[in-house]
Every structure is written in structure tokens, then in C-alpha cells.
């Protein structure tokens, strides 16, 4: 019995060595206005607000989060804001920034001049969150700091806030999401001008969004 207890104890210790440094996106919050979609369909690329939260369990003894911040700055707008605070189980890094939204035709040229790790691709009024080549490069650089550091998608929680500034009613559609803490297999909600709706995509191991990109559709 004592042998089993000691064995289990060392298993926990060994696992902890791998778990403690882990730092991956906990939450993404993205805000889109319906008029932005119309502008994108006309050929524009628009930077939309993005807020990201990372959590690091345990102490950051090697100052890995500040180092990760310096790397991330190369791939984000100059006015991006970074904050590192103490959480319940470790440090939390919050980034307030923006990512480009455009079509498959307009985004490549924009990204050449403005490297970003993420982008929103609009196709037939469907909004798809995708990673870019810059994210792959960033992740490679992060692993040089700590092999457990990563900014891979999907985040544990991705929240889209859709606000209507269109004269006509707009309908938001999504699959396997939460809204107002309620689960929906097929979500559909119409919003009037100056109204908004939040849709949350869960990114756990059993989530469909481990296999396909986070996406929703608007009927304008």
C-alpha cells in the first residue's frame, strides 16, 4: 500500500513538471460590426478589435511571459496593449490588439505589409477565424523560450460579439455554440440596429472546433 502511495506521488510530481509551465490561449474576444462585413465585401481590409488572455500555471521564475510579450509585439499593431497580472494559480497575460478581416483575395497583400498571427476571412457573409504563417513562426520562436508555450487555435473560449449598425435586421447563425450561457446546436438570432449578440465557441478536447475553424454566418 505504501509503495503505491509513493508511486502515485512521484507520478503527480513528474506530471506537474510538464503542466506547470503550460501557457496557451484561454480566451479570445472578437468584436465585429455588420457594416465591416459590407466594407470587406467591397474589397477593404479592416482591423477588428481582439482581446486575448493567456494563463501560466505556477510561478514564472524565468520571466517567460515578458519574453513572450516581446516576441508577440513583432506580429501585432504598434498600439497593442499588454498586461501581466497575478491570477489564482499563476500569471495572466492580457493582450488588447486587433486582427485583419478581409477576403481571400484582399488579405494576402495586406499581410505581407502587416504581419498578424490571426485573421478573419469573409466568404459569402461567413466569418472564419484562421491562423496565418506568422502564427507558425511565432509558435516556433515561443518554443525556444519554453516548449510548452503556444498560441495555437482554438482557444479554450472564443467569443464573437456581433453588433448591428445596419438599417435592416441582421441574422446571426452558428453551430455548436453558447449564447448567454445556454448551449445551442444550431444558433440563430436576429438583431436590430444598435443591438448586439455574443456567441461563444468552446475549444476543449471534445469540441468540433478542434477539427474545423471557428466560424459563423450573417444574413444581411
Regions found by a protein language model. Give the residues of each.
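Bacterial signal peptide processing site
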Residues: 24-26
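Post-signal-peptide N-terminal segment of Sec-exported extracytoplasmic proteins
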Residues: 45-71, 131-149
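Mature, soluble, non-transmembrane domains
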Residues: 75-220
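C-terminal motif of bacterial Sec signal peptides marking the signal peptidase cleavage site
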Residues: 19-22
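Post-signal peptide N-terminal segment of mature Sec-exported envelope proteins
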Residues: 31-52
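Bacterial N-terminal signal peptides that target proteins for export
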Residues: 2-10
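Envelope-exposed proteins and targeting segments
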Residues: 28-32, 48, 125, 156-158
Amino acid at each position: 500500500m505504501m509503495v503505491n502511495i509513493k508511486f502515485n506521488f512521484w507520478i503527480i510530481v513528474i506530471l506537474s513538471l510538464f503542466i506547470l509551465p503550460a501557457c496557451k490561449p484561454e480566451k479570445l474576444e472578437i468584436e465585429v460590426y455588420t457594416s465591416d462585413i459590407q466594407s470587406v465585401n467591397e474589397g477593404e481590409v479592416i482591423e477588428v478589435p481582439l482581446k486575448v488572455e493567456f494563463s501560466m500555471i505556477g510561478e514564472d521564475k524565468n520571466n517567460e511571459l515578458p519574453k513572450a510579450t516581446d516576441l508577440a509585439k513583432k506580429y501585432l499593431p504598434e498600439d497593442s496593449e499588454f498586461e501581466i497580472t497575478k491570477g489564482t494559480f499563476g500569471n495572466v497575460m492580457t493582450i488588447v490588439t486587433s486582427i485583419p478581416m478581409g477576403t481571400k483575395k484582399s488579405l494576402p497583400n495586406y499581410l505581407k505589409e502587416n504581419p498578424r498571427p490571426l485573421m478573419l476571412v469573409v466568404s459569402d457573409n461567413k466569418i472564419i477565424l484562421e491562423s496565418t504563417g506568422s502564427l507558425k513562426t511565432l509558435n516556433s520562436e515561443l518554443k525556444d523560450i519554453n516548449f510548452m508555450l503556444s498560441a495555437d487555435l482554438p482557444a479554450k473560449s472564443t467569443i464573437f460579439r456581433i453588433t448591428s449598425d445596419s438599417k435592416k435586421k441582421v441574422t446571426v447563425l452558428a453551430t455548436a455554440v453558447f449564447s448567454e450561457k445556454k448551449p445551442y446546436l444550431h444558433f440563430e438570432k436576429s438583431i436590430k440596429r444598435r443591438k448586439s449578440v455574443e456567441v461563444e465557441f468552446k475549444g476543449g478536447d471534445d469540441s468540433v472546433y478542434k477539427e474545423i475553424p471557428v466560424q459563423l454566418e450573417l444574413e444581411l
